[in-house]
Amino acid sequence: MRGSLALMVPSIAGARMTQNATFESVTTDSRTASAGELFVALRGENFDGHDFLEQVASRGVGAVVVEQLPPGLKLPAIVVPNTLVALGQIANFWRTRFDIPVIGVTGSNGKTTVKEMIASILAAAYGEEGRLATRGNLNNEIGVPLTLMRLTEAHKAAVVELGMNHPGEIGRLTAIAAPAIGLVNNAQREHQEFMHTVEAVAQENGAVIAGLPADGVAVFPADDTYTDLWMGLAQQRGQRKVITFGLTSAANVSCAHRASGAGSELDVTVAGTGKGDGTFTVQLAAFGLHNVRNALAAIACAVAAGVERDAIVRGLESFAPVSGRLQRKQAACGATVIDDTYNANPDSVRAAIDVLAEAAEPRILVLGDMGEVGTQGREFHEEIAAYAASRGITTVLATGELARHMTAAGAQHFEQFDELLAALDAKLGTKSDATVLVKGSRFMKMERVVQHLLGQHNSGKEAH
């Protein structure tokens, strides 16, 4: 993002400029701030960017955005009531300079995977340099603005992931990103500590639909409990275009599917969308029914953006699973490791267990606590243990405070992480053809189990 303070100030509520200046890009990180950049001094729980203004000045930044102007600071500045809000308004100012399809991706599970599928499709259509995509999962009130500020004249389309864990966040991010296409991938049991009900999650994620312009396109499942809710949001301000997806013939984008090699083969049907209608086949290198649905969501968004069919097929067929999301790896002992350690909630764990259940025996589930479950922690962990047993997963190794509730259904619980690793090693031996699914919420750092199995013995022997 390149610009001047004078051009931006009218777009920032309550802003006051000390003097004009131009800048080449925007940063919020004092450690990497460099000459010619605009530094936005954010405040966080454990830091305050205002404490580093002298440091960024010594690095040669061109200007700063601050809430308080310290005495003696000679840098050009914009003074605002709230720098986090200002960051979003600056990003929206920049975003509105580009008349390109921006796709906003929300949902309880699969956001990052669908975003990467869409990014792969857009790269096939416009080239790697012709599309912008969220890096990793930078999907919050800092990550979304920083993503949008990377827009350039070279970009023909963009896909931006919008995340939340509290009410109101999707609406704010939608206002910043101003998407022309809004996807709700699903509504499931995420962030229940703060959201309390799945309906509240559905309503919150639906804010991306409510925030679309009148000519925007709403994309959501045709076969979800909350389909009618999202349809209602799409029609609140006139008849926005709607493209649905799902495993039902009633969906605009649907498919027949079968297991094939390292993933699934999809016979896709697109109907009732206009220009993108037709049938085609996609070889998807990702396991699980939920990834079939993720692919349908990506196709629906691509159709909404006007992407040609050949680019949709090429993009999806070049997609590779995202790190820590059902990635298949080979353990040192020969076992197959399914690395799904990025995060966990009850519905994503059930989906991962479904993938494990398709593998030949022996099968092992290694699970750490699921977080942000509110008062339902015991219930959710008992449910998952029972579900694993119902799918024929008889070896379940669990760790974490809440995971102790899984023992009633036959799981083994370990207080110490090194005890879990020792038990897993004993079950696998030096040579094994087992399949091991490893999953847990981010704070459990279950990737340490994967590192151990792969022979990367830096996993640490921590207690929980």
Question: Could you say what each language-model-derived stretch is?
Answer:
Residues M8, E37, V56, I90, ...:
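Residue-level signal for inorganic ion chemistry
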Residues S11, E67, I100-T106, L132, ...:
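Short beta-strands and strand-loop turn motifs
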Residues V105, S323-Q327, F443, E447-Q451, ...:
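ATP-dependent carboxylate/acyl-activation modules
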Residues L87-A222, D228-Q239, Q451-H464:
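Phosphate-binding loop of NTP-binding sites
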Residues E67-K74, I181-T336, E361, A386-A389, ...:
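Acidic, Mg2+-coordinating active-site environments of NTP-dependent enzymes
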Residues M1-Q89, F93, A357-A360, A386-Y387, ...:
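N-terminal leader/targeting and accessory segments in enzymes
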Residues L421-K431:
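Short amphipathic alpha-helix with an adjacent loop that forms part of the alpha/beta core around
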Residues G44-F47, V322-G324, T341-H413, S441, ...:
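Active-site beta-alpha connecting loops in nucleotide-dependent enzymes
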